[in-house]
Amino acid sequence: MSIQLPPPIALYVQLENAGDTETLSACFAPNAIVRDEGQTYEGLAAITAWKAETKKKYHHTVTPLDVAQQHGKTVLTATLTGDFPGSPVTVNFAFVLEAGKILSLEIHA
């Protein structure tokens, strides 16, 4: 069974798995916020730097398992596989979308 992801999330997963950290910023609104590993990244420059750093450090890929609407967010449950202890892990990506872009993303294991 194939999972139907909203276009900005589908593009995020595609670019994430391709390691295209520069183009990945095109998925986000200019004022987007990302929360990951206890840190907050605000704006496209910070998000691009965060993604480049995490990709270099973990060499990870995302495999979607499920998607659901919860409390106004689109929550993608996925397997995250990479060079980190405990890999693979199941992770929730909680997206808020606006005007075809990612306005916020919170990542929780």
Language-model regions, residue ranges each:
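Hydrophobic pocket/interface hotspot
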Residues: 12, 23-24, 32, 43, ...
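Structural motif
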Residues: 28, 70, 98-99
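Surface-exposed, charged secondary-structure patches
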Residues: 51-92
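Hydrophobic/anchoring residues in structured secondary elements
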Residues: 34, 67-69, 107
